């Protein structure tokens, strides 16, 4: 949707085909599902006119604290005064509402909700997509943005490297006694990371955080079946006194964790963005931001090409997009996979080595700055839409 809004604002005509019903995606209530929006992604929202609507809905991330199993020692990433936050946390519903509202105001966007593409054709001069209701759409470029199981990617025969972590992420919303102070906690255990992400207080002033707890696949069903009392006891044991007394603010849910990376992200008049191109572990909260970087780069490649008289699906436009995004996406994917494996090594010796390493990072300002820039998405050659407004 972000890609469609950016292209429409640049003057392109866009069809958006969505198999889901917008009403279901924006249903009332906090379900615990939330996303971290990095500094660079927030800049993108600013350029697209989304920031004024979203700003009061998000909780700034003032710092990120990293700890190994509640043992002594941690790394705290906190920007200098005047540098702003490390990002913002939003309930996914708030992001969807803002995107749907912005898209509805764009006359260049044709919306096809509750629809699926049943046939795709690509050729030297254009593409077509036949919808489930028989409608045939024609364009110059086809973009696959349907997520990890992208049928557009599969239809194009693009090879994918993938593996299953055999873990699931348990998602829940927590209400808690202590204010979170804008700190996002990443507590690592051999079974997987345990993240506490700061959310806005509710209308009554109740402090809230989103929980993302990684558990082994074999244990996930048992965790989901626990009574609320037993589940909260397990959560307290994992988080210590970080947030004080806790209660459930939203029901539990889960999703499987896996890695995949495509051999290429373009083909004839085809581009892949987001999870259709690369799926990573949520360990650093970079999945959505990686997709937004794809969108910003593709918008710039297409709009620059249009100014030169090239159509959006021109091979030169797509080659530039692939050169720009392939290495960054691969590096982020490998880094998150490496962190997952590093902190998954059990034993006291491994824990000691990790804590010594964290202590070293804590003392080395240039290295801490590099990690913070990566988390904020402001390193490397950025699309103009990711630069400050």
List PLM regions with ranges.
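Glycine-rich FAD pyrophosphate-binding loop
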Residues: 8-33
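FAD/FMN-dependent oxidoreductases across multiple families
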Residues: 221-313
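A short, Lys/Arg-enriched amphipathic alpha-helix followed by its capping loop at the start of a domain
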Residues: 3-12, 44
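Generic enzyme active-site microenvironment
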Residues: 16-17, 144, 273, 280
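Conserved N-terminal helical subregion
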Residues: 43-47, 54-155, 163-168
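C-terminal helical "tail/cap" subdomain of flavin- and related membrane-associated enzymes
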Residues: 300-389
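Conserved FAD-binding catalytic core of PHBH/FMO-like flavoproteins
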Residues: 45, 126-130, 136, 141-245, ...
């Amino acid at each position: 949707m972000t890609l469609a809004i950016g292209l429409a604002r640049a003057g392109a005509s866009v069809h958006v085909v969505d198999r889901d019903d917008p009403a279901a995606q924006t249903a009332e209530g906090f379900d615990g599902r939330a996303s971290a929006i990095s500094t660079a992604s927030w800049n993108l929202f600013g350029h697209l006119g989304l920031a004024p609507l979203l700003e009061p809905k998000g909780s700034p991330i003032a710092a990120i604290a990293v700890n190994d199993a509640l043992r002594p020692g941690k790394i705290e990433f906190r920007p200098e005064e005047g540098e702003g936050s490390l990002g913002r946390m939003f309930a996914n519903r708030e992001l969807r509402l803002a995107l749907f509202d912005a898209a509805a105001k764009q006359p260049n966007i044709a919306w096809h909700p509750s629809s699926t593409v049943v046939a795709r054709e690509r050729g030297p001069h254009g593409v077509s997509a036949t919808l489930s209701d028989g409608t045939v759409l024609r364009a110059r470029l086809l973009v696959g943005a349907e997520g990890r199981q992208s049928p557009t990617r599969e239809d194009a025969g693009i090879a994918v490297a993938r593996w299953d972590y055999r873990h699931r992420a348990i998602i829940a919303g927590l209400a808690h006694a202590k204010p979170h102070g804008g700190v996002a906690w990443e507590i690592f255990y051999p079974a997987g990371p345990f993240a506490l992400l700061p959310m806005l207080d509710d209308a009554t002033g109740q402090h809230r955080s989103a929980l993302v707890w990684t558990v082994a696949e074999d244990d996930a069903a048992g965790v989901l079946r626990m009574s609320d009392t037993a589940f909260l006891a397990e959560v307290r044991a994992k988080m210590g006194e970080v947030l004080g007394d806790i209660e459930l603010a939203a029901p539990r849910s889960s999703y499987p964790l896996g890695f995949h990376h495509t051999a290429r992200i373009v083909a004839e008049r085809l581009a892949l963005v987001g999870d259709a191109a690369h799926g990573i572990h949520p360990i650093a909260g970079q999945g959505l931001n990686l997709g937004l970087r794809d969108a910003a780069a593709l918008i710039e490649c297409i709009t620059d090409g249009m100014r030169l008289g090239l159509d959006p699906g021109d091979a030169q436009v797509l080659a530039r997009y692939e050169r720009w995004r392939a290495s960054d996406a691969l590096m982020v994917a490998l880094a998150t996979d490496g962190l997952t494996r590093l902190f998954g090594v059990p034993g006291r010796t491994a824990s000691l080595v990790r804590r010594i390493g964290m202590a070293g990072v804590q003392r080395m300002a240039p290295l801490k700055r590099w990690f913070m820039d990566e988390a904020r998405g402001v390193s490397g050659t950025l699309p103009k839409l990711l630069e400050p407004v």
